[in-house]
């Protein structure tokens, strides 16, 4: 039976030094680590993978909660307070992760702009100004200062580091389960017209799926493993996500922004086609096409973010949402480049 790709795999430069792989047999296939036999991640891989995943997804989660907090109507005081508390919880976790990640993550991850972009701080400042919501921008400033290592000396990672990161993963998972429950509650209330929230139900469902994806990763890491997904399962998740982003952008742009809306709809059609066309026999072609289309939507999102920040685009897209979806495209691009 063919080996299944371990989803998200290794989003950093591979280290094939046998010193770091005492319990696993790996081989490299198109720059992926494919698991041939069961076993545990090495200490180094567990720590670095955990930190990179948390740096990306903890920020994504806290921003989801910010979007919810600022999209509820003022009468929903309890729900607004719950969103704010959960957001602050992920801010605290992210601050810890940033502290431990310095010199412990890959340079390629830092340079990908998936953790922060050149626009993140300004987007946070404007979003806080426009909404009155609290955003801890000191975390972002610290992330701009992160440095990575291309190689690690023997003994760099100790058992204490593994315990610290394992505890961070567990606390992230505990909070994430509460966030998923909260999002599902909001979706049910909105679907039953018991609340009014300035977020499409499809957006709430979208951010719930992303949280469940993150939870799947953390559950696997608890066993020092990675979730097993086929290539098409991984591609379909992210291509569906990119199509969703294009759909939301189209819906939030002012009707007068006809060119931008038309471009967004082109991306919807393109990513939908990739999702429908991915099979075992077509996966290599879909990987290449996904890379090409994701580079284009990344450029589109980057231009849109710049336009929104300088007040050059008419929309109801909050600045941090523009930067948020740009980072997700950057994350997917790094994965695709490794696959291709």
Language-model regions: role of each:
Residues 23-340:
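Surface-exposed peri-terminal alpha-helical interaction modules
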Residues 1-37:
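N-terminal amphipathic/basic-hydrophobic helices that include classical n-h-c signal peptides
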């Amino acid at each position: 039976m063919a080996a299944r790709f371990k989803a998200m795999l290794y989003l950093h430069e591979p280290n094939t030094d046998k010193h770091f792989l005492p319990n696993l047999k790996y081989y490299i296939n198109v720059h992926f680590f494919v698991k041939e036999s069961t076993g545990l991640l090495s200490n180094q891989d567990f720590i670095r993978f955990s930190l990179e995943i948390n740096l990306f997804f903890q920020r994504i989660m806290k921003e989801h909660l910010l979007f919810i907090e600022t999209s509820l109507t003022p009468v929903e005081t309890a729900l607004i307070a719950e969103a704010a508390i959960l957001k602050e919880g992920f801010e605290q976790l992210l601050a810890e992760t940033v502290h431990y990640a310095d010199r412990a993550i890959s340079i390629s991850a830092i340079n990908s702009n998936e953790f922060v972009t050149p626009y993140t701080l300004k987007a946070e400042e404007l979003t806080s100004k426009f909404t009155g919501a609290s955003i801890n921008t000191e975390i972002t400033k610290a992330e701009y200062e992160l440095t990575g290592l291309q190689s690690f000396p023997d003994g760099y990672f100790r058992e204490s580091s593994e315990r610290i990161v394992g505890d961070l993963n567990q606390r992230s998972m505990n909070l994430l389960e509460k966030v998923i429950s909260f999002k599902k509650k909001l979706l049910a209330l909105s679907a039953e017209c018991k609340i009014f929230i300035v977020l499409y139900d499809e957006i709430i469902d979208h951010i719930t799926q992303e949280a469940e994806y993150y939870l799947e990763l953390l559950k696997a890491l608890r066993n020092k493993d990675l979730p097993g997904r086929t290539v098409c399962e991984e591609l379909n998740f992210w291509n569906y996500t990119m199509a969703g982003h294009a759909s939301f952008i189209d819906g939030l742009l002012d009707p007068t922004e006809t060119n931008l809306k038309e471009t967004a709809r082109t991306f919807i059609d393109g990513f939908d086609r990739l999702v429908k066309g991915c099979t075992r026999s077509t996966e290599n072609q879909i990987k290449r096409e996904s890379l090409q289309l994701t580079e284009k939507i990344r450029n589109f999102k980057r231009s849109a973010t710049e336009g929104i920040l300088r007040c050059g685009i008419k929309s109801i897209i909050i600045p941090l949402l523009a930067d948020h979806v740009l980072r997700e495209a950057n994350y997917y691009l790094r994965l695709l480049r490794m696959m291709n």
